[in-house]
A protein has these predicted regions:
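Conserved, structured core segments of small domains
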Residues: 1-122
């Protein structure tokens, strides 16, 4: 049986509320699910590139999401600028689908450091 990989979402530290009980609805950098139409997600191999492109100067929290506990449709859509297809969630992220929420540290050069936070590439 094929194991479904976890999906990931980068939340700014100011947007993430670990104590909230409502589903998470921030799509990206302050834009809501309602404004954007979906929530931007990533596969593990895509996270660092997304962080570099959009979150370089932000303090971020890496949300690891169990796709089996997501109730809305996840659709992979091509992002030509990135040369890849990214998962988009067409609904909120249920809190029970969030496996972990980990603040991402910075390396000595100031970049976000995902060492040990993501699975190793196969």
């Amino acid at each position: 049986m094929l194991e479904i990989p976890h999906l990931y979402h980068l939340a700014t530290a100011s947007e993430w509320d670990a104590d909230a009980t409502e589903p998470y609805t921030v799509s990206t950098l302050g834009r809501s699910l309602e404004e954007e139409g979906f929530i931007h997600l990533s596969l593990a191999r895509q996270v660092a590139g997304v962080a570099e492109a959009f979150y370089g100067d932000q303090d971020v929290v890496l949300l690891r999401i169990d796709p089996a506990k997501v109730t809305a449709r996840v659709q992979f859509e091509d992002v030509p600028e990135a040369g890849d297809a990214f998962p988009h969630l067409y609904g909120p992220i249920p809190r029970e689908a969030i496996v972990s929420a980990t603040p991402v540290p910075r390396s000595a050069d100031g970049t976000l450091d995902f060492t040990g936070l993501l699975p190793e590439p196969i």
